[in-house]
Amino acid sequence: MNLKHSKFLTETPDFSRVTNLERLVLKGCISLYKVHPSLGDLNKLNFLSLKNCKMLKSLPSCICDLKCLEIFILSGCSKFEELPENFGNLEMLKEFCADGTAIRVLPSSFSLLRNLEILSFEGCKGPPPSISWWLPRRSSNFSSFVLSPLSSLSSLKTLSLSACNISDGATLDSLGFLSSLEDLDLSENNFVTLPSNISRLPHLKMLGLENCKRLQALPELPTSIRSIMARNCTSLETISNQSFGSLLMTVRLKEHIYCPINRVRFSSGIS
């Protein structure tokens, strides 16, 4: 069912008579603020797009009954603040995009999304997910995106946290446990260093660091790395030689990293 750009639609219809629906597109329904609870009855639904539903602030918990849902797009829902507590029940979910939302805290059940392969919170400037599940859900003590534990997302291959106002590299420590991760975008953030355990990512191929203007050093990176995008990393001063495996890789650095290369110093390791 394609209802995209129905700009006067304020509530979704009752879906109880179309339970065999596999795709539901509500992209660009800029007046939509309420989703009918019968959405949870769509047992065969595998694709749901609510992209750019600017008035949408929440979803009924029954959305987590969508056992076949594989792709869920919530990007551009700038007023959307909170996922249902049982979000982790979406056990078949492979892709979740929430770019530009106002999500503040991830439910603890998020760690149960073992099939999740693509996750994007680009432009969520916070204060989104807290690293401590026991903190008050309405806490206003955070001024930047603070990562929640992600270590159990063993299938995750692509993660975008660009422009999330991450200011402390230590909050990225949990990334070192994402054993399947291939593409990691941390561009446009405010951290000074990256955690050393990023070297534990055996399949990491692409690392995005563009416009991380406070970043001063790159630690050892996994040998699987193929591309480091670091344009406008104007404070970058030190790169571990071990990040590139050999002197040859260091000589060919310009093919792999884009930064003010003339003043970068290479070290045998960064503690």
Predicted stretch roles:
Residues M1-S144, P149-G169, S174-S271:
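Predominantly recognizes leucine-rich repeat
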